[in-house]
Amino acid sequence: MSTPDPNQTIAGPVRAPRNRAAHITGSIHDDATASKLGFRGGTVAGSVHMDQFPPLLVEAFGPAWFETGSLSLYFKFATTDGEPVQAFVERPAPGATDAQVRAWMTTPGGTLVAEGTASVGQPAQPTALFSRDLRPADPSQLRILSALRPGDSLGDLHASVNGADQRTAISEGGLTEPLDWYSGASPWGGPIASPSRVVQLLYRDLLAKPKQAMGPHVGLFGAIEIRFRSGPVFADQAYRVTGEVVALADSPKTEGLWYDSHATDDAGTPVADMRMYLRQLKASSPHYRDAAAG
């Protein structure tokens, strides 16, 4: 495989992300469950892969990436615990303030793990995920997502990024490419959240009730975009988190949920947004017993 031109591409080091969710029995991260569903083993969450990009994005755009930047990725290949991967970002023009570039991740053998865009400011073109044709499904054909409709609210709550948990993840090697800003002083004052922690903030509690309505099933991240509106997201600071369904999708093996979520501070200032595509595996759901039996 050819080496990227350093004048055109910023390449990160090869890293071996850990599957820190392998202990969650019955999830896609559990070896036994994932193997039963046709995967090579328990998968590393796509949000974990996002943590390899900030050093490249700070080199590309400066600290401003954490203030008005985005990272928009569609996941193409599920990796397993410790499998080596490398992040790349197209090098922007010097001094770019409203710019968008290509971002991607591969294995050392050249398998594409994720692809999309990274930006700062307000570039003219849409991000990788906002440029996709979502092709909504016929709701009457859905089983796992039958209780949801585009426009539905996913909730309104307060949540925060746990600074102690983030520091523990760093010390245990669970945050693949840590910045000093995640555990100590940053250009904005105190510690800030890594991309995977921003995803957790805008996903975990917000999806708790909708997941109950879906019934037993196994899901995985299909695509994630985080965008800082007035960032960064600080550790140990409470944010109001809201979200809504954008679209529902259907394929032979999955039902898909596209949703947007938002974090605002106590003053009502938008801090960060996320667009996520969640894949629900039909073979894992009692709603699709025929598929599971096949």
What is the role of each PLM region?
Residues 1-18, 80-84, 88-149, 230-294:
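HotDog/MaoC-like acyl-thioester-processing domains
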Residues 2-68, 123-223, 285-294:
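Hot-dog-fold acyl-thioester-processing enzymes
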Residues 63-79:
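An N-terminal domain-cap segment
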Residues 70-75, 223-230, 245:
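Short structured motifs
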